[in-house]
């Protein structure tokens, strides 16, 4: 009987102090969640600023790369259509209307210039 009374008294004390600690635990949980949200917010802000910096660097690199990779326009070879809507003929060729292609496709072609 004495042991039951001791265990019941321990149960009552544990329940009483357990409730008190529960309030403290709730306060601690609130503080932890607030700190976590604060840290997450700061981490998000840092990540966003990092993304903005990377985008600025990427823009600068692409501007330099676009200027560096620009090539001269390609030229058309022999027996290729030329004119206003096409690329110019390569050196050594001239854009002329010929009997073989011009009358059928109605456009001049790049050919070796005639001497006559």
Curated annotation (Swiss-Prot):
Disulfide bonds join 75-90, 82-95, 89-110. Its main location: secreted. The keyword Ion transport does not apply. Residues 1-20 form the signal peptide. Pfam families: Toxin_22. Residues 21-74 form a propeptide. The keyword Signal applies. Expressed by the venom gland. Keywords: Cleavage on pair of basic residues, Disulfide bond, Ion channel impairing toxin, Knottin, Secreted, Signal, Toxin. GO terms for molecular function: sodium channel inhibitor activity; toxin activity. It comes from the Eukaryota. It is found in: Secreted. Ion channel inhibitor. The presence of a 'disulfide through disulfide knot' structurally defines this protein as a knottin. Belongs to the neurotoxin 14 (magi-1) family. 06 (ICK-Trit) subfamily. This is U16-barytoxin-Tl1a.
């Amino acid at each position: 009987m004495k042991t039951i009374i001791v265990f019941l008294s321990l149960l009552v004390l544990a329940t009483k102090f357990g409730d008190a600690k529960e309030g403290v635990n709730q306060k601690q949980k609130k503080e932890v969640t607030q700190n976590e949200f604060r840290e997450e917010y700061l981490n998000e802000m840092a990540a966003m600023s990092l993304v903005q910096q990377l985008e600025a660097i990427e823009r600068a690199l692409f501007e330099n790369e676009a200027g560096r990779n620009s090539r001269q326009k390609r030229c058309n070879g022999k027996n290729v259509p030329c004119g206003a809507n096409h690329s110019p003929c390569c050196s050594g060729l001239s854009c002329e209307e010929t009997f073989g292609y011009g009358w059928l496709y109605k456009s001049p072609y790049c050919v070796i210039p005639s001497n006559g």
